A protein has these predicted regions:
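Residue-level detector of short, conserved catalytic/binding motifs and their immediate flanks
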Residues: 8, 62, 94
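Hydrophobic side chains in beta-strands
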Residues: 12-14, 66, 98
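Short coil-to-beta transition motif at edge beta-strands of beta-rich domains
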Residues: 52-83
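Amphipathic helical hotspot of TIR/SEFIR-family domains
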Residues: 86
């Protein structure tokens, strides 16, 4: 039997420093973690319920495709360190092959989270709000070994 391929498609409309739809100052793509932004909440829930085991066992190939939307959160185009810029146009398409699905706890205990900005943010949230024993630690984290943007850069 042929290997099944699944695609998740959506429109990214917000960029946070740990959202995949982000660029360095030179418009290079940045993170390999695909998990942030409310637009991915339903996507993560569906993957967890229906596909996580199959993705991790490599019995399906899973991809995420998104159109990068215009965003200007809080009238800021960069974070406090000036490291990230939101896309200025709706001309970029983001595509990633999902390589692994982990729980938040598994991710934070794995070497994949070492020295990553998102991991520091998660640790801060966990400590600040006492989330160690909460359902937050069971939320899934979607990892991708590679991804690309297609289209016009701002």
């Amino acid at each position: 039997m042929d290997k099944q391929t699944i695609f998740y498609c959506y429109r990214m409309t917000h960029d946070y420093g740990i959202n995949p739809c982000v660029f360095t100052e030179n418009y290079d793509t940045t993170p390999h973690l695909l998990t942030e932004g409310g637009c991915m909440l339903q996507l993560r829930r569906n993957i967890k319920k229906n596909w996580a085991d199959k993705i991790n066992s490599k019995s399906v190939d899973a991809y995420i495709m998104a159109v990068a939307g215009h965003s200007n959160d809080g009238k800021k185009w960069r974070d406090d360190q000036g490291m990230f810029i939101t896309p200025k146009y709706n001309h970029l398409i983001f595509v990633a092959k999902i390589s692994e699905i982990l729980t938040m706890k598994e991710y934070l205990l794995s070497p994949k989270s070492n020295n990553r900005r998102d991991a520091y943010t998660y640790q801060w949230l966990i400590e600040k709000y006492g989330l160690n024993q909460s359902s937050f630690m069971k939320e899934i984290v979607i990892l991708a070994d590679r991804f690309n943007y297609f289209g016009k850069s701002p």
